[in-house]
Amino acid sequence: MRRALCMMMALLGAVAAAQAQDAQKILETFRRNFAIASLDVKIQILQDAAGGKTAADMGPLFQQAVDFVTDNAGLVSTDARFNQLAEIGAEQIGKMGFAAGRYSVWKLFKATADPQTLAKAAGALGVVGAGDPETISNLNRYVDSQNTLSASGKAPDGAVIAACLQALGKLGDPSSFPVLFSAVNLGYGDQLTAVARNALFAIRGDFAAMLLGVIKDRPLPEKKLALQMAIDSDKLTDDKKAQLAELALDISLHSSAADAAGKGTLRDMRFLAAAGLAARKWSHATPFIIEHLDMTIGEFDKGLVDRNHLLDTMNALGAMSTHDAAVRLTQFLVLINSYTEKGKAYDDQIVFTVIANLGALGDKVAFDDLMYTQYLTYSATVKKAARAALDKLKW
């Protein structure tokens, strides 16, 4: 029995070796014929090889075809048959996953301007480029250049950019996240945006870390969009969302913009980040929320933000549940009390919100100034709120 099994294994090995030799001979025959054939016959050779039983072994032939087209790049625009050769070669390299052909396919990608050939080449690179940093980097740079082109008002070829986006999604490398994120938010149109979004979410790795990279390193509009994506994501914990929001608030507080649009984006990002921190009661961010309040008060005085923004900011500080938050809100109440004592007009809603947050914080640091409201010309509603806040203070 044992001897029979050994004989069977030996026979199978011999058959496999013979088949491999046969496949190699067939490949060599195809390659010799391709080298001497006319363009029409070259196309027929590739078609026969792709449809034959040994198609899986024909990688070097299809690479030879791609190299032939690249070597004759100056003639490609004069004869459509070159494009046909390139498309068959690139597509088959991708189908069989012939990794040795990836650099030839990239050379073709750079050499041709034909959209269909570019799309076929991109599709192949999405397979044979797996694990190859150079191929991934090349595709990243190309998509980034098309994003820049689109942002300037020019429209890249939709089929080509779609194929490149899909290729990056298949490759799934974290280095592609920034360019795919840009593509999602560029306004390519619903169909291309959906392709970009699918590719983005196919990227492997730490989603929070990739969003952090966008918030730290990409242009202002993308920083804001990355923050929004983080807050809305169901892939991140509340702690991760809060950490990203804290970073975004730090950046938006300490960055500058030369134009009105940039300043508006920074302001929007501040309020978005503060809201995200308040919703998660992220007390670690108290210093940034205090700085945010100081900036918001100045903007409110200049008419740059409305009352709701100021109220939201005070509520965000109240959500921090820290002594420092109570100290800053008490300082604000001192200022309002001073204005009121001098007969200046006050906003009931602003005063009420300060007092309500001091009550929620329950810090006795506010005692004296909450008491002082009872001696000023505030409305009965404000005084009642102050008494309620006093009752909540912890001793």
Language-model-derived ranges and their functions:
Residues 1-4:
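Positively charged n-region of N-terminal signal peptides that target proteins for export
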Residues 6-15:
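Bacterial N-terminal signal peptides
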Residues 14-17, 305:
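Hydrophobic alpha-helical segments of integral membrane proteins
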Residues 21-33, 54-75, 98-110, 130-151, ...:
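Amphipathic alpha-helical scaffolding segments comprising HEAT/armadillo-like alpha-solenoid repeats
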Residues 32-35, 40-56, 75-98, 107-108, ...:
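Structural detector for internal amphipathic alpha-helices that build alpha-solenoid repeat scaffolds
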Residues 113:
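Surface-exposed, active-site-proximal loop segments in enzymatic domains
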Residues 375-377, 381:
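Predominantly the C-terminal beta-signal and adjacent terminal strand-loop region
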